Design a protein with these regions (language model features):
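Active-site core of PLP-dependent enzymes with the aminotransferase class I/II
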Residues: 121-130
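Active-site glycine-centered loops adjacent to acidic/histidine catalytic or metal-binding residues
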Residues: 148
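Hydrophobic beta-strand scaffold residues
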Residues: 140-143
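Short glycine-/small-residue-rich Rossmann-like dinucleotide-binding loops
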Residues: 28, 118-119
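Short, well-structured alpha-helical segments in soluble
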Residues: 98-110
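Subtilisin-like serine protease catalytic core
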Residues: 1-95, 109-112, 124-125, 138, ...
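Alpha-helical segments flanking ligand/cofactor-binding loops in enzyme cores
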Residues: 104, 131-134, 158
Length: 180
């Protein structure tokens, strides 16, 4: 059972009305952001994209004229958004202390899974966010993190903590070649 509330720490009551049976909570932890960006709204769409991959509702669509049904991995799951990033002129900022506060709130909210699609986690034993993930894991929460976009070489994977699932994407040309 979800223990949180659908509220904005930014003081905008309109965000509570955006909650529904899919989005059951929305929190902003962007405390260092300029005041106009302190909302739980997804400023660049990345969080919404990953949330739909994880928990998108089942929908019927047409793909090249063929009707198909698609959904996220867990279409009956509910989402609580914990916004920890905000836009800046140089791209964006995700402060570690904001992430730690959001993980602590997720533990209090009784979530089952945390999806953290933000790079980082250089040192599992000295990084505050990685240690917050350890607290979440100790509370019985599965933590899935981004492996990052730094490349295939050794040491380029983010979030190497043994208590998280570091998740990556790949592509494949579907060709298997063999020389005889």
């Amino acid at each position: 059972d979800y223990l949180g509330v659908c509220a904005s720490t930014g003081g905008d009551p309109d965000y509570a009305s955006a909650c529904n049976d899919k989005l059951v909570g929305a929190w902003s932890y962007t405390h260092d952001a300029p005041s106009e960006t302190v909302t739980p709204e997804d400023s660049d769409g990345h969080g919404s994209h990953t949330a739909s991959t994880v928990a998108g509702n089942t929908v019927d669509v047409e793909f090249f004229g063929v009707p198909v049904t698609i959904s996220g991995v867990a279409p009956h799951a509910q989402i609580i958004a914990y916004d920890v990033c905000y836009p800046t002129p140089s791209g964006g900022q995700c402060a570690g202390d904001d992430s730690v506060a959001a993980v602590q709130q997720a533990i209090l909210d009784g979530v089952d899974v945390i999806n953290y699609s933000i790079s980082g986690g250089e040192d599992p034993y000295n990084d505050a966010v990685e240690l917050a993930f350890l607290d979440a894991t100790a509370a019985g929460i599965t933590v899935s993190t981004s492996a990052g976009n730094s490349g295939p070489d050794a040491g380029t994977v983010a979030h190497r903590s043994p208590w998280v699932l570091s998740t990556a994407a790949t592509s494949h040309n579907r060709k298997f070649t063999h020389t005889v």
